[in-house]
Amino acid sequence: MTKTTFYYDFSSPYSYLAAERISGLFAEAGVEQPEWKPISFGHILKTTGRRPWSFEEDRSVDFEEIQRRADERGLPEVVYPEGWPVDNYSLNPTRAAIYAKESGRVVSFSLACFRQVFAGGRDMSDVDNVLIAAAACELHPNAVLKGIETSSIKDKLRAATDEALALGLEGIPTTAVGDELFWGDDHLEEAVRAASGV
């Protein structure tokens, strides 16, 4: 069976929207769940020289689209933390997600983290907020705090990000079905069909 991977970063509201529904879409299709793989989108942008939509003058169009999708799906009003997307960008939540993955809790941690950011408007550069998300999925805060500082966790995040770059990933969220990339929350259904072999 073709491997499917979901690449994301907690700075992305479109990743939040995708994270809230990707598991359900794959389950409904009877397809094996994708591997959740957090990456450093900041490093992707720096390496590729791409400019994110959140820096553009017409970004209000995206804000409206994000809220429209959230409303359609019964999600809370989308809130952006003060300083988003640059001033409060941090690798702490992504490193914590890598740590959670080792405990089999990457999905529950990631959802808790996304909800902290875009439903609660909380700044994830504040490690206390990362630890609240960790506690919500029964990860011990002290263990997470130690884990995100270890070289092995940092190396795994770096390796995941390099893997995404090697595949040709340009934006997030991206769902990779084998070598085929589906960029965006609005292309999840296509990714599911590809994973289903349809």
Language model features with spans:
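Structural alpha/beta surface segment adjacent to cysteine/selenocysteine redox centers
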Residues: 14-117
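C-terminal cap of thioredoxin/glutaredoxin-like
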Residues: 4-5, 10-32, 112-198
